[in-house]
From Swiss-Prot:
This is Small ribosomal subunit protein uS8. Belongs to the universal ribosomal protein uS8 family. The keyword RNA-binding applies. PROSITE patterns: RIBOSOMAL_S8 (PS00053). It comes from Prochlorococcus marinus (strain MIT 9303). The lineage of its organism: Bacteria, Bacillati, Cyanobacteriota, Cyanophyceae, Synechococcales. The keyword rRNA-binding applies. One of its GO terms (molecular function) is structural constituent of ribosome. Pfam families: Ribosomal_S8. One of the primary rRNA binding proteins, it binds directly to 16S rRNA central domain where it helps coordinate assembly of the platform of the 30S subunit.
Length: 133
């Protein structure tokens, strides 16, 4: 079956693995998924990114982070905002603050994929891909 929204697929795989306390999860590799994974790593939601396979069958292996004695997931929720049927764009001043700054939004800008904080610092807006907290 064809996957019409690879970003939603990636977020769902990460969310499901996190809820089940899996150490790693695999997502199909693409430029967008690599960029999103890099932002999640920079913001401290995942610990390591590696690639597996080659060509069309390349997958990213994401090592998830947990905290505390009971291994609480660092990622509590991931929500897709802009969808293929309804794109959501925001300028610099309208970029959302997720949970009053405790979470983050991942933004696709003309300067690449970045967190909402980085987009504000650089003074760029763009497509709001998802919220993570």
């Amino acid at each position: 079956m064809a996957n019409h929204d690879p970003i939603s697929d990636m977020l769902t795989r990460i969310r499901n693995a996190s809820e089940k306390r899996h150490q790693t999860t695999r997502v199909p590799a693409s430029r967008m998924s690599r960029s999103i994974a890099k932002v999640l790593q920079q913001e401290g939601f995942i610990s390591e990114i590696s690639e597996e396979g080659e060509g069309v069958l390349t997958h990213l292996v994401l090592e998830l982070k947990y905290s505390g004695k009971h291994r609480h997931p660092t990622i509590r929720s991931m929500q897709r905002v802009s969808k293929p049927g309804l794109r959501i764009y925001k300028n610099t001043r309208a970029l959302p603050k997720v949970l009053g700054g405790l979470g983050m939004a991942i933004i696709s800008t003309s300067k690449g994929v970045m967190s909402d904080r980085d987009a504000r610092k650089q003074g760029v807006g763009g497509e709001v891909l998802c919220y993570v907290y």
